[in-house]
């Protein structure tokens, strides 16, 4: 059998570097933490796996170990793991187990592992109207007024009920822009961005169809684009998951929990090989994405 460790070395932007206590790319060791961008997500996970390998006699193992390290995970993820998986499928090369070092811990390392992730769809909408003076309502076509009933439908919609592995699909409005900044001038157009994180109970295509039907039912003139940037995946816990759970209990002294929470990961690509997947990594608070985009990414 083949066990693959999947990781990424690309990182999110640092933000203002003067807000960092240490140079974000120095890897500064303060005696307690290694400081630097990407230590938690997820260079630390890669370092841990390499360190573990250096302490065992790999020649004595009855299975093979591989590394799949990408530099295209934080961004559009168009040329990283997805391309490797396409090549592996073409070659009919089989991966049996995959360990992903993404941050998964809530409080104490190992208290949570992931065996799935929700899907994600980004939607950009432009509502078309007609600009005019607020004193002459008959001469304007206010896109803000037009979008309100659409938003009401959108926010009240029960997309699904979730299931035993996934919470119900959720929606968040992330950007809305309209107007020229004056009190007495209505906007010409309105721009809206929103995101849905969806379970295995619904597809990205079904969400797209619902949104388009809402727009049609309200008679809204519009331009809309959809980007299904991640499909949900679920890895049925079997032998590998059992081994990871037992190892955590042996080392840490507690039973871990299994979840499908969090954002997207490259697990969505590697899952297409049919391998069993476990995501196990450091505490959320060690990396920028989970500390309100603050500086001082660090890992002990």
Q: Predicted segments — roles?
A:
Residues 107-114, 158-159, 175-181:
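Glycine-rich, charged/polar anion/phosphate-binding loops
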Residues 2-66:
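Active-site metal-coordination/substrate-binding segment of hydrolases
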Residues 151-159, 232-277:
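Active-site-adjacent substrate-binding region
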Residues 290-300:
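Single conserved hydrophobic/aromatic residue that forms the stacking wall/gate
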């Amino acid at each position: 059998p083949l066990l693959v460790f999947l990781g990424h070395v690309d990182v999110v932007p640092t933000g203002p570097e003067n807000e960092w206590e240490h140079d974000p790319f120095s890897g500064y060791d303060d005696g307690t933490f290694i400081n630097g961008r990407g230590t938690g997500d997820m260079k630390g996970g890669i370092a841990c796996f390499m360190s573990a390998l250096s302490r065992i006699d790999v020649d004595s193992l009855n299975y093979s170990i591989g590394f799949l390290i990408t530099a295209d995970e934080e961004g559009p993820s168009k040329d990283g793991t997805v391309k490797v998986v396409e090549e592996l499928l073409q070659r009919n090369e089989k991966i049996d187990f995959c360990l992903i070092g993404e941050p998964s811990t809530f409080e104490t390392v190992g208290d949570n592992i992931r065996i799935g992730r929700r899907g994600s769809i980004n939607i950009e909408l432009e509502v078309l109207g007609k600009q005019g003076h607020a004193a002459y309502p008959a001469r304007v076509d206010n896109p803000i007024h037009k979008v309100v009933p659409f938003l009401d439908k959108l926010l009240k919609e029960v997309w699904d009920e979730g299931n035993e592995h996934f919470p119900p699909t959720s929606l968040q409005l992330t950007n809305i822009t309209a107007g020229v900044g004056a009190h007495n001038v209505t906007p010409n157009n309105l721009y809206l961005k929103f995101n849905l994180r969806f379970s295995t109970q619904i597809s990205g295509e079904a969400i797209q169809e619902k949104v388009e039907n809402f727009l049609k039912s309200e008679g809204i003139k519009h331009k809309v684009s959809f980007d299904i940037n991640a499909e949900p995946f679920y890895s049925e816990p079997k032998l590998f998951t059992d081994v990871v759970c037992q190892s955590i209990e042996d080392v840490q002294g507690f039973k871990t929990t299994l979840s499908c929470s969090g954002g997207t990961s490259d697990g969505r690509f590697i899952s297409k090989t049919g391998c069993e997947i476990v995501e196990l990594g450091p505490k959320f608070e060690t990396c920028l994405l989970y500390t309100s985009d603050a500086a001082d990414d660090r890992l002990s």
